[in-house]
Design a protein with these regions (language model features):
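Non-catalytic cap/lid and distal C-terminal segments of serine-dependent acyl enzymes
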Residues: 1-280
Length: 280
């Protein structure tokens, strides 16, 4: 039940949560620094033939300038919505604080709605189409984003991590940075949610990208993180080993804890400073 006296809330996939923010976290607090803006954006999806929603973070100074920015697509989990990263995930405040501390470059962060139908698994292909055919073109039309591969990143948690793998490796020529939080190829270790039975295994479907040396050359970072108590730990480990087998250099870390926002916020704090870094 929502607290009617608490204005802070977060939309999940099927209900609302009341939020209580406990101060003290270095990069999650609301600090006296320049703040960007988070907008709720409606767009018409030609692939899904209906109006859809996403949240978009623009960094401090975006509205008053003409500069173009790199773009980071940040995907939510199966119990969440496009609102989740900017509310319970504190993504806007995290980015403000990282940018103010000069730990992360100013960037546009796009948080789309990962659910395209009643179930995430059965409708996964619909979201992938919506992402490539509608979300990316809409962002590049409406916002001053740099459109080359080296200035485009994607990451996601849980379901969003699986979507990052599906979209990222099917379109590896478009992304230089990929992050997978508490996720992997579902079913690869006999746990998690398996792929649809009428599809070949993920490794087979993506063989052209996995074994393409030209695509690997432009890929600057593949980053995985999972909690030691996460129910998808074996899935993450098996996915990392599979990618290494195909010659990918994967950064992998295991943290304390499980499948929780306590970890995912920390992963964003660690991942965002690695993006769009010319030294990589």
């Amino acid at each position: 039940m929502l607290d009617p006296r608490n204005p802070a809330g977060s939309e999940s996939n099927d209900n609302m949560w009341s939020l209580v923010v406990v101060p003290g976290a270095e990069f999650m607090d609301t600090k006296d620094v320049p703040h960007g803006a988070v907008a709720e954006v409606t767009y018409q999806s030609s692939s899904l033939k209906r109006a859809r929603r996403m949240h978009v973070y623009t960094p401090p100074g975006y509205e008053n300038g003409r500069k173009s920015y790199p773009v980071f697509y940040l995907l939510h989990g199966s119990s969440d919505s496009d609102d989740s990263w900017s509310s319970v995930g504190r993504a806007g405040f995290i980015m403000d604080n990282l940018i103010a501390a000069k730990k992360a470059k100013p960037m546009i962060v796009v948080m789309p709605a990962g659910h395209s139908g009643p179930t995430a698994i059965r409708n996964g292909k619909d979201f992938e189409r919506d992402f490539v055919e509608d979300i990316m073109p809409q962002i590049e039309k409406r916002y001053r984003v740099q459109t080359d591969r080296s200035n485009r990143a994607m990451a996601g948690l849980s379901m969003g991590g699986g979507q990052t793998l599906n979209i990222g490796f099917a379109n590896l020529d478009k992304f230089a940075y990929l992050g997978v939080f508490s996720s992997g190829v579902f079913g690869i270790a006999g746990g998690g949610r398996p792929a649809a039975t009428n599809e070949p295994p993920w490794e087979v479907r993506n063989k052209a990208s996995l074994d393409n040396p030209k695509l690997k050359k432009g890929l600057k970072l593949v980053w995985f993180a999972t909690g030691k108590d996460d129910f998808l730990l074996k899935t993450s480990r098996a996915t990392v080993e599979m990618l290494k087998k195909h010659g990918f250099s994967v950064v992998y870390k295991e943290s304390e804890g499980g499948h929780t926002w306590l970890n995912w916020r920390d992963y964003l704090i660690e991942f965002a400073p690695l993006l769009f870094n010319e030294s990589r």
